[in-house]
């Protein structure tokens, strides 16, 4: 299931009273045609201060690490924790062709971005499925490295030179980024030493810290940040609405079933990173109709255990859910550590790994497309734990280890 990472908490200051919350009613539009043009992602050609340039709005129901509010011609996005322990960052997303607000009061120090953006540099493969789902893959102009990418469409664009690699040596080529002048460079939710110089050079660095969310749906809802930047709010509402509906329907079906005991994870560098009870992994297991001995622990991150401690509590778990790219057979599992054979799930052949789709460079689609599609992950888990609830299920990410 991967190694869950902890989340901290930085609180957002109250935004100016002139802003409308995302759940507020839509303001009357003095110019429907102009507002419609804005909703379709085109620049405003005749600004009217009485027009609401966001007739299609987004609300956040699961994501907690960013907020989104509206004024008539701009949005304010605040990422509460752009990287672990960092202070909140605020972005003013101004509709192209309209005036930016004064950077005073609560907006002092905010980064102003003209939207919809036309060029994006992406630091994480998790962004790729979002822009694909939103139909704006043509706006992707840079990726950190193609090595971990699964998407054949993106790889073809890299091969053709349409998309450039800007950190292929694991360090950001600041001169290349500055020379390209992308509208936005979206981070991977961690700070990099290159971001300071890039900001000083005028590059708009926008944080995407979806991995700090504690629920799978919360992570997926960051598609709405991408939509706010690209002017594809209606599409994001449609896409996420379907994901949310399918997820909750599956969870409701699994809730009625008898819980199955699960062993999540595997050894990594001599430690077993066991997801805590408040983590997104724990939420997925519970929603799939499963349980595990550490489900009652607090915290959204993980705890490190030795294998003996895991055996003591989880030896008899019926299903083992791992995430190891190299495992294809039970023999591969045993070769990793002979002690794995002591688990009941190994003896019965119920060992699964989220490694069905691996890219040419070793990138795992579970970490690329899966972050934005928790409905597909949950579907795999339900079919694994309760196959009677999902006859004929086509697995997206998980596969069973063969004998």
What are these regions (language model features)?
Residues 2-6, 22-128, 235-263, 389-403:
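Bacterial Sec-exported substrate-binding components of ABC uptake systems
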Residues 110, 115-119, 130, 162-168, ...:
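Second-shell loop/turn segments in exported
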């Amino acid at each position: 299931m991967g190694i869950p990472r902890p989340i901290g908490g930085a609180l957002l200051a109250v935004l100016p009273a002139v802003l409308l919350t995302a759940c507020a009613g839509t303001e009357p539009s003095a110019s429907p045609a102009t507002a419609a043009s804005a909703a379709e992602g085109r620049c405003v050609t005749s600004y009217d201060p009485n027009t609401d340039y966001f007739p299609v709005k987004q609300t956040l129901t699961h994501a907690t690490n960013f907020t989104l509010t509206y004024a008539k011609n701009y949005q304010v996005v605040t990422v509460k924790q752009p990287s672990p322990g960092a202070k909140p960052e605020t972005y003013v997303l101004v509709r192209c062709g309209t005036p930016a607000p004064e950077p005073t009061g609560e907006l002092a120090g905010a980064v102003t971005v003209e939207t919809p953006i036309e060029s994006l540099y992406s630091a994480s493969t998790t962004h790729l499925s979002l822009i694909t789902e939103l139909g704006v893959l043509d706006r992707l102009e840079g990726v950190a490295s193609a090595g971990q990418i699964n998407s054949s469409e993106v790889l073809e664009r890299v091969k053709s030179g349409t998309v450039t690699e800007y950190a292929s040596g694991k360090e950001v080529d600041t001169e290349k980024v500055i020379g390209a002048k992308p509208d936005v460079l979206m981070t991977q939710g961690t700070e990099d030493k290159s971001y300071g110089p890039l900001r000083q050079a005028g590059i708009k660095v926008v944080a995407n810290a979806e991995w700090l969310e504690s629920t799978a749906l919360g992570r997926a809802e960051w598609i709405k940040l991408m939509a706010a930047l690209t002017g594809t709010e209606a599409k994001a509402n449609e896409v996420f609405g379907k994901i949310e509906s399918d997820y909750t329907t599956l969870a409701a079906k699994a809730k009625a079933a008898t819980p199955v005991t699960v062993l999540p994870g595997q050894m990594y560098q001599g430690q077993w990173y066991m997801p805590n009870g408040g983590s997104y992994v724990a939420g997925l297991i519970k929603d799939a109709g499963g349980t595990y001995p550490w489900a009652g622990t607090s915290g959204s991150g993980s705890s490190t255990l030795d294998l003996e401690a895991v055996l003591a509590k989880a030896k008899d778990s019926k299903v083992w859910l791992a995430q190891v790219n190299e495992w294809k057979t039970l023999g591969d599992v045993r070769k990793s550590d002979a002690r794995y054979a002591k688990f009941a799930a190994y003896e019965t052949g119920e060992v699964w790994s989220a490694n069905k789709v691996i890219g040419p460079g070793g990138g795992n689609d579970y970490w690329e497309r899966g972050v934005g599609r928790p409905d597909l992950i949950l579907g795999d888990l339900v079919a694994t734990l309760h196959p009677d609830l999902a006859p004929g299920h086509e697995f997206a990410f998980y596969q069973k280890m063969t004998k």
